[in-house]
Structures are given as C-alpha cells and as structure tokens.
Amino acid sequence: MPTAASATSPPPAIQANQHIYNDYFREEFTQTLDENILQLLDRVWFRSELVGFENYPQRNNPDRPLIFASNHSGMAFPWDAIVALSHLWRHLKKNGAMHDLPRPLSAPLLSQTALMNPYLVREFWKKCGCVDATTLNFETMMYYQDHNLMLYPEGVPGIGKGFNRKYQFQRLATSMVRLSLQHGTDIVPFYTINAEYLNPYAYSWDWINKYTKKIGIPFLPITVLLLLVLIQPWAFYLALPAKLVFVMGTRIRPSDLTTKKPEEHTREDYAALSEQIRQKMQAEMDAAVAAHGQQPYRWGELWQRMKENRRYFPFFLPFAWPAMFTEFERLYVKEGRRNFRMQLDRPGAWLRMLWRNPITLAYFIPLIGWIPLAIKGYRGNKLGQKP
C-alpha cells in the first residue's frame, strides 16, 4: 500500500539532486548500442534467457519505483548486468512497457575512470542509465517516476567474492530494506545464473584489492587468464561464453516481515530484516541454480549460433569487441551520427575498424600495449573524488 511518504514532496536535498535523472542517461544511445552491438553479442555469445518474466511485476505503490535486486557474479567484468538490462530493454520495448524498465545503481568505481567502461567508451555506464550508488542518489531515485530501480545489494563484496563462494549471497545492504519500508515499495529479486562462469576459478585477496582500488579497479582476479590480460590487453574485458539465465524470484514486501513503523526501526532491526531477506533470496537462487545452472556453457548451442550468424564473423568473438565498441563511439560521439547501422556483415569490416581506430591495435600488443590504453583510460579520471 502507498505510504504517507508517497504523498509528500522530496526534501530539499533530494530536489537539489534530481538532476541525476537526466545528467547522462540517453535512451537513444542505449537503443543504438543495442541494435548495433549488444543484440549480436547476446544472440551468439551469451544466449540469455528470461525465466518467469511473462507476468512482469507492476508497482504496488504507483508513486514509487520497484526495487529490482540481483546477485553479483564474482571476479568478472559486469557483462551480466549489461546483458540483463539490454535483454529487459528489448523485452519491455516489444511490449510497449518501457516505464517498467529498471535503471541501475552501479558501483562508483565503474565510472571514475574510462578504464572501467567497456573498451574505454567514456561514460558508458551513465549514458546507459546507471547512477552512482551513493546514499543520496539511492534516496533521490526513490522519487523517480519514469522507470523502476535496479541494484546489486551485495555491493563491492559481491563483486569481489571468489569462485569458491559462487552463488553465495554476501551480506545485503540495509539501505535497500530501509528505503523499501520508508517508501512502501516492494523488492523484486531475480537471479543471475551461470555468470559465475564468465571468469571461472578466479580468486582474490583483500590486501591486493586494497591497492588496485587506488587505481580504480575494484579487485584483481587471480586466475590463469591473468597472464592473458598482460600479453593481450583486450582480455581485461574478456567474458567466456556462459549462457546467462535470469530467473524471476518472488517479490518481497519488507513491511510484511515487521510490525514496526519505519521510523521505529534501529540499525540492528534493518540488519536483521536484511539477513531474513538474504536467506529468502539464497533459497530461491539455490533452486534456480539447480534448474538452470548445471550446464553453464552449452557448447553445442554456442556452435550452432555461430554457424547461424557466421556472416557477422569475427564480431561475436571477444577479440573483435574492442574495435566494434571503439568504432561505435567514433560514429555516435565524435561524428554525431544517429540511427545508423554498422554493417558488421560487410567483408573486411573489422580491418576497416582497426584502420579508423588505431588505438585498438594496442589491445593486441603484449605488455607495452597497456601504456596507451592506460593513458586514455585514466585521462580525466575522478579517482578520490566523491561521486
């Protein structure tokens, strides 16, 4: 049910911060990116499926966004979030329900350097709708009317968990429960299955991550692929071809789990409610893994998709992605084009992209290729600045 909070106007601090709704988000950028790149990558490489999204959740409080929440895949570049949001974008656009699309709160480290944006595409995350996950921004987004909200409530610990803790929910942020109660809106969990295999058998140590965070990298995955990253820099963004399955969970109404009013809750109360919700989500995710996570790669399906889309070779393979993303940025940002098609099936397209974007050659140069990429990736960085 709507609460009294839904009838009140935002506090002055929230009103002053509402510029975040439209500072960077460009629906046209997201649509053009999806049509030119993400649809192909999803169709061939990730082969994502939505399970249980037929009856798409509607707001229980019409004045407040639903809070969608999912699990992080540890030790991997966030391709799972990119694929989930792009698939939902297409699903909801097809059904004329873009109002139901969730906009993500993302870790601020992702936007502080170009290096943590896919292939150095500047402001990639924010142009696609992401907002830095700060307390003020979260509270501000609770007054957002155009879309729903999405977050990964495990936060950075969820990103940094090693393969030995795959599919294990870490402690959830209490802010999710607190704001859900205060604004009378439901939490809608969905579970990301097989993303743990985008970068499998990767582990990390806190003492190493303490230093990598200083240069804008949330964690350093220690894996056999790390050597490949050094000698072939494009592998920094590498994802193995795990079939991503997104499974809708049972919506959660935190007000049903407590008899107290929101203002009566202590920090300990919110922590206890968060743990109760974590256990509910863990049980549902375990069932989703049992149903959809036993064959994470499905090599036969991957081979079939490659054959069906062979005219787009090599663009569905990760080594070709740097040129493709860089060419997209050149066309959209530098040349200001709109409603264009990149003609990925044209013979010689990849070689022409390399010629037009010589920086992409650095992705293939062992060790020293990192020098120009790091210069571009850290130029104008916001490290040490508050989001």
Kindly label every feature range from the protein language model.
Residues 1, 154-157, 266:
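Intrinsically disordered low-complexity regions specifically enriched for long asparagine
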Residues 222-316:
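C-terminal folded domains that constitute the principal catalytic or ligand-binding module
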Residues 35, 39, 43, 86, ...:
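Charged/polar, solvent-exposed surface patches and flexible loops
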